[in-house]
Amino acid sequence: MNKGQRARDKGQIVWLFLALATIFIYFYGLNIPLLGPDEPRYAQVAREMLERCDWITPTLGGARWLEKPSLLYWLEMVSYKIFGVTEFAARFGSALFGLGTIFSLWILGKFLAAENTEQNGEKTQTADRRPQSDFANWLALIAASSIGLLAFARGASFDIILTFPITASLVSFFIFDQSQEKSFTARRLPLVAFYFFIGVSLLAKGLIGIIFPLAIVGFYYLLAFKFPGKTFVFSLLWGTLLSLLVAALWYLPMYQAHGWTFVDEFFVQHHFLRYTSNKYLHPQPFWFFWLVLPLMTIPWLPFFLAAICNLIKNIFHHRKTQNAEQNEKLSTFDSRLTTFALAWMLVPLAFFSLSGSKLPGYILPALPAALILTADYAARFVRQSKRREIALQTLAFLTFAFVVVMLQFFTHTVARHETVKNLIVAADSRGFADAKILTLHNVSANAEFYGTGRLQRLPDGKRRYLYGVAQVKEFIEQNGNQPVLVLVPLEYLDELTTSDLVAAEVLSDNGNLAIAAVNLR
């Protein structure tokens, strides 16, 4: 065995180790308490659907919850059946879809390397071509270790659930568009996958699941100054039908069950009004996502910025440096890949920058495109020396190690102040496991999951907001003078404990909220 072969074997072992580390890190620490307003709500919706054996109608507190489609809930329901109703199960589908996003990008890299090898007539791998065959690994590694993907793949929310099928659909389209094979299978299967995953995207987060892929493809053709071929144009007929058939698994029975109520709540209120207004109180400046998206590429931000600088230089100066010309050898499809990634990145950026409602996760479907540009630059960077390759692999591993340290030693501390789980556990251990739970001067979304079945609600299913101790007293009287648990912000705790209307015993607090056992005096 020569030195070159030994070096390649050693390199493959390193890549295998990093792949296993990626899988480990994406499932590690998913059992921390649910955080924020969304995770506990979505996890509870799935639990209620599972308890009713209802795969169609989402509910929260028994009331219809028509904000989002079903895919996340289905993933959580299946996970609950396998792992039980736990935080890990609630997040398992998100982690799986995070890995699916990474794998889709790896497939893209493999396709580019294979096409490049074919075009150059190179059927065997040689030492100087190694960086090209490794491009798929670099693309996957950079995606896996980006802070945006690491963070959102750990949350029981819809953003990563949308990002994977959009990534899979666009990768499928690019393979169709660039494939040199003319066989029926090679030309049609990627198109079938493109439209199938559009259907899955519709199940993931609604209309955006079809708007983004088609708009990105259209913008790509515009940037590339070319017309789509007949095969793609004709595919719009049968392909759109395929996408709608996949989406109909949920949309059709939902409409049959709820009619205009579903259309108004889901499409009008949570699609059009959410986009065109600030009804849901998430305002941000126009440039918000132009800052958020680059930050999601950390720790690869310098490479992303360098890639963008090179791209701008090439666009506006119509020339390439000698170094860039040499780097062009990475792939014969490099310019078309860059054009496609640019279209992929700009469409969501432009779309959501005009939205009246802005949250960081909205821009996640654009992150894979940013990572393609980043990985393209980084793969060229490591061609200069073996030391650079080792340095970047080490950076990715250190990022994984940093995540483990944060989850092990810091996240639980932060979660303690953000969750009511420990408060309710403490109260239950004191003999109040059957007591109703009220919220005074707050509506804790976290309690939706951890206080399930015990929260006070209005007739329409919405949580009741209590403004004073008198309302607590009134509820106790209506509840047969049984003691209740009250979640109250610490700044209002004295109002409860010093009241002449009720007797309150503070059982625990998390630094933000306290839980008290309350009865009549």
Each model region followed by its residue ranges:
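Membrane-integral, polyisoprenol-dependent glycosyltransferases
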Residues: 1-2, 9-322, 326-384, 410, ...
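N-terminal signal-anchor/signal peptide hydrophobic helix marking the start
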Residues: 15-17, 91, 388-398
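Small-residue-rich segments of transmembrane alpha-helices in multi-pass membrane proteins
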Residues: 243-246, 398-404
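Membrane-interfacial segments at transmembrane helix termini in multi-pass membrane proteins
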Residues: 378-392, 399-400, 418
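Short periplasmic/luminal acceptor-recognition loop of GT-C membrane glycosyltransferases, typified by
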Residues: 400-496, 501-513
